[in-house]
Amino acid sequence: MGTHCSAWLRWPLLPLLPPLLLLLLLLCPTGAGAQDEDGDYEELMLALPSQEDGLADEAAHVATATFRRCSKEAWRLPGTYIVVLMEETQRLQIEQTAHRLQTRAARRGYVIKVLHIFYDLFPGFLVKMSSDLLGLALKLPHVEYIEEDSFVFAQSIPWNLERIIPAWHQTEEDRSPDGSSQVEVYLLDTSIQGAHREIEGRVTITDFNSVPEEDGTRFHRQASKCDSHGTHLAGVVSGRDAGVAKGTSLHSLRVLNCQGKGTVSGTLIGLEFIRKSQLIQPSGPLVVLLPLAGGYSRILNAACRHLARTGVVLVAAAGNFRDDACLYSPASAPEVITVGATNAQDQPVTLGTLGTNFGRCVDLFAPGKDIIGASSDCSTCFMSQSGTSQAAAHVAGIVARMLSREPTLTLAELRQRLIHFSTKDVINMAWFPEDQQVLTPNLVATLPPSTHETGGQLLCRTVWSAHSGPTRTATATARCAPEEELLSCSSFSRSGRRRGDWIEAIGGQQVCKALNAFGGEGVYAVARCCLVPRANCSIHNTPAARAGLETHVHCHQKDHVLTGCSFHWEVEDLSVRRQPALRSRRQPGQCVGHQAASVYASCCHAPGLECKIKEHGISGPSEQVTVACEAGWTLTGCNVLPGASLTLGAYSVDNLCVARVHDTARADRTSGEATVAAAICCRSRPSAKASWVQ
């Protein structure tokens, strides 16, 4: 995790501090750290008045920019910094800010070098300078934050094709409606041996090269060694014999050196190269394969988000550190399809003392052990490699095939189909740490059928938030992708001490929120995110009744159906807590909760959308209660009905609603105290009207 550094200095005290002591305080290597919702890094917050150059327009300027660096000390690159400017910063202002930093540094006797200016991916620049100048740089206008550069690494340490491509797809050629394959895959990796028979004529080796020097003065740059990782992955994606998407065009960008090591800044420049290529010569669908991982990087994740918004599909390796993938980038970026690795038995890949990463930031797993592919040793040689790089290459190939058949598929549609048609429940979850098992998907990738074979199936996925803090007011937030509808929200706490969940609008987007309770250890928010064409969804809530009555809420608009129920407790006293109830018999289409809870109903209208409730209860001791939707129906909402037992919460696993129970030791519970899981199941029949099925 690394050693954290944080400082907050009140400026009236600054004149009392010697300059050297002040600098040490600002750049201290130890102290309390700050952690982002989706990662681990070190952050320095400054709130200092600018006194640079005596300029009147800056005398009142207070720097609120932050300094971030990788939490893994050995991966840091001190002396090279990515200066990220505010999103609205104009092109001329970027250049002026870089020039201003150079000028002011020169006045203090420092020489700095601007290595690259980012215009197209995000506003900012890459600079080589002394750490003594960080305080100066953080106080410049337009600066949002500065991130110290750090290393990224390659993630590699014939059953694979049979596993992901069913027999009936093996001989198929994927082409767009006009008969051509227009998909292009960009590979950010080592160099590639383009003359290998597997990929000859299919790979364009660009002139892009942004790599650090190899470690060690005696390192011998043997060509076959330099090309090994990239050549192998290119063969996995589009090789003639061992490729997933045979014939797909591939562009090679060199961002990893002969030792498989690169930098965050080099990866950023590579992504901007792709963006510039888009702007100069628009083409068909683009897939970017990122078979590398470094420590959590806010700017690398932001760059992936910006590129994804242009229609590019990014696929990344989860990482080979047998750790939470959310601690690494680009794996932790929500806009990236993140892939873990499995072996021939569909079990997590072990690589010595390490292995595949896991957790809520992983979307699915794919073959990544002993994968046969092109070898750079000769133009006809093959070799096996292992790791999440190979797994990500498989999914990139699958995505390329899907886009070849249907070029208009969006990132949200691709991800939902990959999840829906994956092989489920084959991974032994005991391999993962206990606290990560519920968060890690039990999914192994397969090639989905085309749209006309899916029959208009309603597609949903479960999105977990980061774990909230332990304070009584700590909240967790789970978000769907912009194209998805948030159909329900639930929460989960390992201690059972939580104050519920609800849906609210933040920045024009509906988000799922969960609230921790006094004495709790933290809570997760669990969102159910679905693709519902032409949907019109809304949230209705009723405050706590507080009069010995149940709290009721239903869908107000005509033709709207209930897709989920949530609740938020107004009281701290857990002894009176009861979960909200979905009354499918006496009160169809309503959410009903305890008198002390505010209850929320998620309601949607879409052509042919129909929903119903399914319940299942157990009165005896049980760690969990489950209820599943039938074939043809999709789980959109999951919660637990009232009972005397304290529950840990409820969440969706594929088409299964899981209610977790706290006091499993009590064997004397009556039927009235049964724990009942309640699922809302929906389906889409475009020819029918929206309806509630009783």
Curated annotation (Swiss-Prot):
- Which of the residues bear the PTM Sulfotyrosine? Y41
What the entry lists under InterPro entries is as follows: PCSK9_C1, PCSK9_C2, PCSK9_C3, PCSK9_ProteinaseK-like, Peptidase_S8/S53_dom, Peptidase_S8/S53_dom_sf, Peptidase_S8_subtilisin-like, Peptidase_S8_subtilisin-rel
Q: Residue limits of the Peptidase S8 domain?
A: 158-470
The main place the protein resides is cytoplasm
Q: Which residues are glycosylated?
A: N536
PTM annotation, UniProt: Cleavage by furin and PCSK5 generates a truncated inactive protein that is unable to induce LDLR degradation. Undergoes autocatalytic cleavage in the endoplasmic reticulum to release the propeptide from the N-terminus and the cleavage of the propeptide is strictly required for its maturation and activation. The cleaved propeptide however remains associated with the catalytic domain through non-covalent interactions, preventing potential substrates from accessing its active site. As a result, it is secreted from cells as a propeptide-containing, enzymatically inactive protein.
Site feature: Cleavage: Q155, S156, R221, Q222
Sorted alphabetically, the keyword list is:
Apoptosis, Autocatalytic cleavage, Calcium, Cholesterol metabolism, Cytoplasm, Disulfide bond, Endoplasmic reticulum, Endosome, Glycoprotein, Golgi apparatus, Hydrolase, Lipid metabolism, Lysosome, Phosphoprotein, Protease, Secreted, Serine protease, Signal, Steroid metabolism, Sterol metabolism, Sulfation, Zymogen
Q: Where are the stretches annotated C-terminal domain?
A: 453-694
EC numbers for this chain: 3.4.21.-
Report the top EC class in one word.
hydrolase
Question: What is known about its induction?
Answer: Down-regulated following a high-cholesterol diet.
Write out the annotated subcellular location. Answer: Cytoplasm; Secreted; Endosome; Lysosome
User: How, per the record, is this protein's activity regulated?
Assistant: Its proteolytic activity is autoinhibited by the non-covalent binding of the propeptide to the catalytic domain. Inhibited by EGTA.
> Hey, what's the signal peptide range on this chain?
1-34
**List of catalytic residues:** D189 (charge relay system), H229 (charge relay system), S389 (charge relay system)
Query: A Gene Ontology biological process annotation?
Result: positive regulation of neuron apoptotic process
Q: In which tissues is it expressed?
A: Hepatocytes, kidney mesenchymal cells, intestinal ileum, colon epithelia and embryonic brain telencephalon neurons.
State any GO CC term: extracellular region
Domain comment as written in the entry:
The C-terminal domain (CRD) is essential for the LDLR-binding and degrading activities. The catalytic domain is responsible for mediating its self-association.
The task this protein performs is described as: Crucial player in the regulation of plasma cholesterol homeostasis. Binds to low-density lipid receptor family members: low density lipoprotein receptor (LDLR), very low density lipoprotein receptor (VLDLR), apolipoprotein E receptor (LRP1/APOER) and apolipoprotein receptor 2 (LRP8/APOER2), and promotes their degradation in intracellular acidic compartments. Acts via a non-proteolytic mechanism to enhance the degradation of the hepatic LDLR through a clathrin LDLRAP1/ARH-mediated pathway.
Concerning PANTHER family, the annotation shows: PEPTIDASE S8, PROPROTEIN CONVERTASE SUBTILISIN_KEXIN TYPE 9
Protein name as it appears in the record: Proprotein convertase subtilisin/kexin type 9
Organism of this sequence: Mus musculus
